[in-house]
Amino acid sequence: MVSALCLVAIAVALALTQSCSTTKSLAEGESRLAKNEIKVENDKRFKTGEIEPYIKQKPNSSFIFGWNPFLCVYNWSGHSNSFFARISRKLGTAPVVFDSTQISPSVDNIIRHLEYLGYYGSTVEASVKTNRKVSKVKYNVTLGKQYTINGIRYVLPESGVLDEDFCADTNKVLVKKGQYLSESLLEEESRRSSTYFRKHGYYSLTKNNYFFSADTLTTPGEAFLEYRINEYTRNETTKDAVPFRKFYFNEIGINYPDNLKIREKVLRDLNLIHPGDMYDETVVNRTYSRYSALNILSSVNVAVKQSDTASVNADISLSASKIQGFKLNIEASSNSSGLLGISPGLSFYHKNIFHGGEVLNLNFTGNFQFKPNSSTSSTELGVSAGIKFPKFIFVPVQRFKKAVPSTEIKASYNYQNRPEYTRNIISYSFGYSGSYKKLHFQFNPTQLNVVRIYDMNQDFLETISSNIFLTSSYYDHFDFGAGGTIYYTTCTDVNPKRSYHYFKFQFNEAGNFLSLFNPLLPKNSATGKHSIW
């Protein structure tokens, strides 16, 4: 019976697919762009995903085996302007109308990007096939020549101010002998190296101070690279050169509005920039992150400006956000068994409860279900509270000053009264969380989970007995222990543009700690075991 229903469902889906037109709404002479295909003729290992973003016109996305049902919905409208047609256009997705004028710019984009990747003299040929108002564009790519770096000459300012720091960093230089020459590699090295120098006091040094020139004529297929750091930028001349020097922090100002009622010590402790310290860009960024984690602030700005030939001033500007508020929510529901329900919820928050940036959250929830003309009913009540401190409590701050600190205490209670059982659930946790660069961590030295069951209906218990994990949640529990999570990612962007990797490790430990309280717990004379209740 089940297999027959599956066959019917597949048949209906196929019928809908076949009868669905994705070009019905197109005008005469128009076609829908269905696909962009990239084929690299001379290197099957080359990832076409590197150049796909540089094609200017993209086809509609697909969901099911290359089919987009929203295209069909849109095309139900045809050329009509009826109410149904307008609804179809609003709910559906319009087809991408093929535009042949976008092909030539796409070819130019691909060639330029291949040159950026180190393929010089690449060719791209585009061809279009159109059948029944459906167009497919194929880009045949022949990768150009690559040059191997056979040697590198470093040229630093004659003053020698960069020599010591540059030599200390040579092991981390990305451009090495034997690699393929590419603008992308040189640009990445410019960013990396300039960031390194700005960590070591060189406030004015940027990636635009880096110049590269390559000799590709002396040895066929190879390039001799000159790696130069100049005291003027790429859009300047030698007349604009300003000698590099190390800078130090001078005056530090923390500015915030009068309505920000917070202890000044809290703001000072979050600041990692101190007068007399050598300029370090990472310290500035870390200070910004620490202030941004403070929920009481709506905006944070850390401005660093040169004050004289060897010092900079830092101005930290803070803006206050809404301090407190509450939310009331009521939902009504019904189900096929005739049960009616109402679920009220009330939440309250305060972002500065003790005038130190502490965030208090309180939540009250309820769920009441009943059946008209019947005694069947259920009641669920819940309350939860949490407070978050913008620091590590009971932990030496200096040991973790590089991290964005947070300490959170949470507790909750949930009461459930149903015809099958009465259940009480209590949870509590005390823990630390923070982040440093690409690493995020959370550690709970203590966490508690208590489940207490009363008036269990044995018939109900038998119906769920086949599911071990579900059954375990309907027995008494008292779990007390510790736990934590470590998360590392290679990309911290909100919207990553490339693939990335991450590592996540979780651990929980519970049980043995309770044995410390055995002398205080009642003992069963028959079994010799201690019990909590």
Q: Model regions: which residues?
A:
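Bacterial N-terminal signal peptides that target proteins for export
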Residues: 1-6
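Predominantly transmembrane beta-strands of Gram-negative outer membrane beta-barrel pores used
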Residues: 327-334, 340-394, 408-413
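Transmembrane beta-strand segments of outer-membrane beta-barrel domains in Gram-negative
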Residues: 199, 323-325, 375-533
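Beta-strand secondary-structure signal
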Residues: 111, 136-140, 224-228, 313-317, ...
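C-terminal motif of bacterial Sec signal peptides marking the signal peptidase cleavage site
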Residues: 16-19
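Secondary-structure transition/capping motifs at alpha-helix termini
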Residues: 293-298, 318-324, 350-358, 394-395, ...
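Transmembrane beta-barrel architecture of outer membranes
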Residues: 224, 268, 286, 311-313, ...
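Periplasmic polypeptide-binding modules associated with outer-membrane biogenesis and secretion
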Residues: 21-334, 365-370
